[in-house]
């Protein structure tokens, strides 16, 4: 038995919303730190913040994921001091080149979470990504 597109959308929307909240939290955190909190930040830094803000307003889709990959990789290359603040979930969510910055063990955890989400979707079972993530990472 397959699920309807509206049921699938509920599972996908919760997953998308969770990651959008992480993106928003990351953005808010880094704005309090150098170089973004400096009175005269350079144009590249301002453009990065603007692109991050625009990404949060952009609808989900291929260009959203591509832009997210570019911005997450830019954090690694241009702002390595911010890496401890970058939620690892965002590297997984945006995928692509971002996966190069994740160890295999971490990728395996996120793969299992995605499989659990898909299984729940197929079985019409309730599923909280946030709860499953916490359990997978030993937070419960």
What is each stretch, according to the model?
Residues 10-13, 35, 39, 81-82, ...:
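Short, well-ordered helical secondary-structure segments
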Residues 33-42, 57-63, 80-81, 104:
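Charged, low-complexity interaction regions
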Residues 45-60, 71-78, 82-86, 95, ...:
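Non-catalytic interaction surface on structured domains
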Residues 62-121:
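Amphipathic protein-protein interaction modules
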Residues 18-29, 47-55, 67, 71-75, ...:
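Charge-rich, solvent-exposed alpha-helical interaction surfaces
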Residues 2-53:
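Short terminal alpha-helical segments
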Residues 4, 8, 26-33, 50, ...:
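A generic structural signal for ordered alpha-helices
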């Amino acid at each position: 038995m397959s699920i309807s597109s509206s049921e699938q959308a509920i599972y996908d929307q919760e997953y998308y919303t969770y990651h959008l909240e992480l993106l928003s939290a990351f953005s808010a955190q880094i704005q309090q730190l150098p170089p973004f909190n400096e009175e005269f930040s350079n144009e590249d830094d301002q453009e990065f913040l603007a692109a991050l803000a625009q990404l949060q307003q952009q609808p989900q889709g291929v260009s959203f994921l591509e832009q997210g990959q570019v911005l997450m990789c830019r954090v690694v290359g241009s702002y390595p001091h911010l890496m401890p603040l970058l939620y690892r979930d965002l590297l997984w969510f945006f995928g692509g080149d971002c996966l190069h910055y994740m160890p295999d063990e971490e990728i395996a955890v996120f793969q299992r979470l995605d499989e659990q989400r898909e299984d729940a979707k197929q079985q019409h079972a309730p599923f909280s990504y946030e709860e499953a993530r916490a359990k997978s990472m030993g937070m419960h």
